[in-house]
């Protein structure tokens, strides 16, 4: 994989507790598309996550605070964010596994995003989960580039996840937003 982290090491928080990040380790996600009267199509994706899912560089933080919260990954370093970490731990993998049932939109720069997650109790929250879909060494890949809370629903042209998956599998161009 293109220098993506496959196994995240835990973060030693300044409060003395260790934050486990193994829930963001690379994993396989299998999506099955059913068509009436046809054989189901199976899509096997290798999924990886960026450190942007649990880090954030806030302007209000002092350099000392940022340094004490710094998480070092192979490509970059950013301050750990407890809020993003909690959201990712609770919702991120479940959101990725539910992509076929989710409202996926074009997120710009060749990325897609899911913007709503189901909370316990039936409520919904706005959680912007941006991902790229591509092929790498004949494998289907999803890389979650960022995941963060948003205050209101983002606008974007909808795209069905199975359209993305089918086009990747068949080496066709991925869906683009209309101009």
Swiss-Prot record:
Disruption phenotype: Cells grow normally at 30, 37 and 43 degrees Celsius. They have a slightly slower growth phenotype as they enter stationary phase. Induction: Expression increases about 5-fold as cells approach stationary phase, under control of sigma factor S (rpoS). This is Protein YjaZ. It comes from Escherichia coli (strain K12).
């Amino acid at each position: 994989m293109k220098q993506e982290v496959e196994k995240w090491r835990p973060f030693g928080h300044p409060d003395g507790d260790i934050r486990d990040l193994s829930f963001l380790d690379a994993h396989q996600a299998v999506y099955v598309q059913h068509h009436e009267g046809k054989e189901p199509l199976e899509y096997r994706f290798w999924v990886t996550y960026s450190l942007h899912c649990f880090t954030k560089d806030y302007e209000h933080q002092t350099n000392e605070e940022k340094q004490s919260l710094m998480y070092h990954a192979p490509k970059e370093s950013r301050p750990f964010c407890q809020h993003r970490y909690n959201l990712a731990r609770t919702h991120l993998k479940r959101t990725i596994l539910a992509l076929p049932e989710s409202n996926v939109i074009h997120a710009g720069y060749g990325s897609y995003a899911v913007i709503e997650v189901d909370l316990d109790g039936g409520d919904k929250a706005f959680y912007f989960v941006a991902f790229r879909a591509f092929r790498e060494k004949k494998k289907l890949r999803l890389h979650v580039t960022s995941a963060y809370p948003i205050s209101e629903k983002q606008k974007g042209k909808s795209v069905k996840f199975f359209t993305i998956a089918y086009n990747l599998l068949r080496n066709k161009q991925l869906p683009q937003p209309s101009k």
